[in-house]
Regions:
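Juxtamembrane intracellular "pre-TM" segments in multi-pass secondary transporters
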Residues: 4-14, 197-253, 441
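Hydrophobic core of transmembrane alpha-helices in multi-pass small-molecule transporters
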Residues: 24, 107-123, 257, 341-359
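Central cavity-lining transmembrane alpha-helices of secondary-active solute carriers
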Residues: 55-74, 289-301
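Helix-to-loop junctions at the C-terminal end of transmembrane segments
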Residues: 68-81, 166, 298-312, 403
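Structural signature of the two symmetry-related core transmembrane helices
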Residues: 84-98, 313-329
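Cytoplasmic helix-loop-helix junction between adjacent transmembrane helices
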Residues: 116-150
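Glycine-rich segments within core transmembrane alpha-helices of 12-TM secondary carriers
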Residues: 144-162, 385-395
Length: 441
């Protein structure tokens, strides 16, 4: 296999990144997917059971990403056909989306949502590898930024379509899965036409060697394995807690656990809460759209904002901003009744899911990038991915039960408290040395 620097000596060639636009239709299709599934489960089962089933669906969706990442990682190592895997992934997503319309059972809905989680990961790594395999190294950063932007804009357009659909056909939400499936087929066809198999292939670990590729891959899905972590890897990751010299990595993992448990708790119950307060489906999609739009814009400036500041400080700022937003939504859920709940949701959710997430994500993944390069990359990334997957799954699973039996406001306030706890943990991290900072360049 060639190294990631293998193309550095090539003569300048025109950019061959038109294939990146094949990701746009499927991003449109999957942008509103989680919201659609949650609303549909409530339609099928009512508010209480629909919320619990929504939590179960989200938990399985997050949990299945762990074996999916392992399976597709091994497949990529053995089958060096980028175009085939990407086209197959999109086609399988299309089949799963269209099948929502024909099997309208709760079990079938949860199963298909889980299938989409599994098959969509087949394309995440090949897409990022293709950039490094087909573009000159000087163009990598720009190509990764374009891939991220095209995907995000697709999600925004998908949510915008959902807002219009919910206004025109409010009783036919399930029918929306059919055009979303057609868009996925379009992406599959475009990938076959536009993607050219690279002249040389790279190993998966090269994605962890460069910050742009590392960030873009984790943004697509934060679960990414180079090797399968062993029990000793987990023990080593948390063993240094007792010493002030070695506690940085364990504290970082603990703060990550708290963040993703909090995210699972909040995100799983947020849509059902709006439905409980008689917020229309159109307005629900509009709130999620606002969050995605702000997130897309925030990521365009987050790198520059974080780059000039201490990483621990910016991580704390992102956590505090998100935590106070969650707490504000929790207080609103406690004090308000009826559709007026959409007002604080429309203000605070874009702050939490957009601006605060972009700041925290950029800061935390920069620290993770440093961790990967200061230790065994495969082990460190494997532990991180397992931690993220399990934490997200756990938060999603208990979210529905807490909301139904104790109240949605309890779920949201607890989500904020967990983030404040993460602030206390991450605030104990040692400030990065100049050596660490240079490793991030």
């Amino acid at each position: 296999m060639n190294s990631c620097d293998g193309g550095s000596g090539l003569m300048a060639k025109p950019s061959r990144d038109k294939w990146l636009y094949s990701t746009f239709p499927i991003s449109v299709a999957t942008g509103p997917l989680g919201t659609m599934v949650q609303l549909y489960l409530i339609q099928l089962n009512g508010q209480a059971l629909g919320t619990i089933y929504g939590g179960l669906a989200s938990a399985i969706y997050n949990g299945i990403s762990i074996p999916a990442a392992l399976f597709w990682g091994l497949t990529i190592d053995r089958l060096h056909k980028r175009k085939g895997l990407i086209a197959l992934s999109y086609a399988m997503v299309a089949i799963a989306l269209v099948s929502f319309y024909f099997d309208r059972s709760t079990g079938g809905t949860i199963a298909r949502y889980s299938v989409i989680s599994f098959v969509s990961l087949a394309s995440a790594t090949p897409l990022n590898l293709l950039i490094m395999e087909t573009e000159q190294k000087s163009r990598w950063a720009g190509a990764f930024a374009k891939l991220s932007l095209v995907s995000s804009l697709g999600n925004v357009v998908g949510l915008l379509v959902s807002v219009v659909w919910a206004d025109l056909l409010p009783a036919q939400l399930v029918l929306l899965f059919v055009p979303m499936g057609a868009l996925s087929v379009t992406s599959s066809a475009l990938s076959v036409v536009l993607i050219k198999e690279p002249e040389f292939v790279l190993e998966r670990e090269t994605l962890a060697a460069r910050r742009p590729s590392f960030f873009t891959r984790l943004l697509a899905n934060p679960v990414f394995f180079i090797t399968i972590p062993s029990l000793s890897d987990f023990r080593r990751a948390f063993r240094g807690m007792r010493s002030s010299l070695t506690r940085g990595v364990p504290l970082f993992y603990i703060s990550t656990i708290l963040f993703y448990v909090s995210s699972g708790l909040f995100n799983t119950s947020f849509v059902p809460a709006m439905h409980l307060y008689s917020v229309s489906d159109q307005e629900v999609f509009a709130v999620i759209l606002a969050g995605m739009a702000v997130q897309t814009l925030s990521f365009q400036v987050a790198g520059r904002f974080v780059g000039d500041r201490n990483l621990v400080t910016t991580s704390v700022q992102g956590l505090l901003l998100r935590g106070w937003s969650y707490l504000g939504i929790g207080v609103a859920a406690l004090l308000l009744t009826g559709p007026i709940f959409v007002a604080p949701a429309l203000v605070l959710y874009p702050i939490a899911g957009g601006l605060a997430f972009a700041i925290y994500y950029t800061s935390a993944n920069t620290m993770m990038f440093t961790t990967v390069h200061s230790k065994s990359a495969g082990a460190a990334l494997g532990v991180y991915s397992a931690v993220v997957g399990i934490a997200s799954m756990s938060g999603s699973f208990v979210s529905g039960f807490i909301s139904v039996y104790d109240g949605y406001y309890v779920t949201f306030i607890l989500s904020g408290v967990l983030l404040f706890t993460a602030v206390a943990v991450i605030g104990r991290l040692p400030k990065p040395s100049s050596r660490d900072e240079s490793a991030l360049q």
